[in-house]
């Protein structure tokens, strides 16, 4: 999960266009994600909430993606990894997601419901 903040010197329309229009296809093409959920934060619920403009949820299939850049990016070899990383760095920098970002590793577990049979 990543918490994004829009750079103060970038207007909202440009930021959203670069994030949704330009970055999204790059993120999908260069990483081994099977889910990419973009949540745009329109307002804070409490007065003293920190500024967060977006919450991104990404799901990576192999546990190896936690410790291996090759697995994280779905790279076939070192050259492919380098290319994918360069694309991501350029793409995130274009809308300010290369600075002032919080990344929170999480896990997802599916439990059976005691109320429904599978």
Write out the residue ranges for each language-model feature:
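Macromolecular interaction modules
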Residues: 1-118
């Amino acid at each position: 999960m990543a918490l994004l903040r829009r750079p103060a010197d970038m207007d909202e329309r440009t930021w959203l266009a670069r994030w949704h229009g330009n970055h999204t296809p790059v993120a999908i093409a260069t990483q081994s994600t099977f889910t990419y959920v973009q949540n745009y934060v329109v307002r804070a619920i409490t007065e003293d909430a920190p500024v967060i403009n977006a919450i991104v949820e990404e799901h990576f299939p192999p546990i190896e993606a936690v410790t291996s850049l090759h697995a994280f990016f779905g790279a076939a070899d070192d050259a492919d990894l380098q290319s994918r990383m360069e694309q991501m760095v350029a793409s995130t920098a274009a809308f300010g997601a290369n600075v002032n970002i919080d990344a929170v590793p999480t896990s997802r577990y599916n439990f059976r419901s005691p109320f429904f049979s599978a």
